Amino acid sequence: MKTALDPRHLNRQKAVQDLFAYSFKQQKLTTDLAKDVVKNLKSVDELVVKSAPEFPLERINPTDLSILRLAIYELVFDRSQPPKVVIDEAVELAKEFGGETSPSFINGALGKVLRYPERVIKVIADHLGAEEAKITPEADFKKDLNATDIEIADLLLLLEKDLSLSFPKDQKIVTVKDILDFVEDD
């Protein structure tokens, strides 16, 4: 568990504060992390809306929105930290800065984001070293993406760990859609 003095935690705290202030007045950002979130803000906000459809953006508490924006950026666009770390950190930030229901709201929304096709496709592209545009649902791993059996097996192991799920041993994975369907149905 990270301490309150952990530099990564402190950086996230500053980024949340930056994003909070930015939501009221688009001012100069002081952290690289917040700058990266804002560069991807349109896409991040689309995922925020999708993860909490019962709340329009303008109805989400600005503190919760700032935490969600940061965590969604880290989960979908940055992906340098394991998902569990990102979600745990976001929940901790919600406990520090948010209201009574903030931690459960943040945790629930981020749990949905983990399994979104947009994120799974980015993970597949990164793992296979393929262009994201080539990772369509119809793409055949071997024919279209030139993946070997070992690369496909490694990808499945990565996704199992990343998404806390288990692909059945008899599950035939031929296309990207096979993975997306399984993740959606699990």
Which role does the model predict for each range below?
Residues 117-151, 162, 166-186:
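Phosphopantetheine-dependent thiolation modules in NRPS/PKS and related acyl-activating systems
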Residues 154:
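Conserved alpha-helix in the HATPase_c
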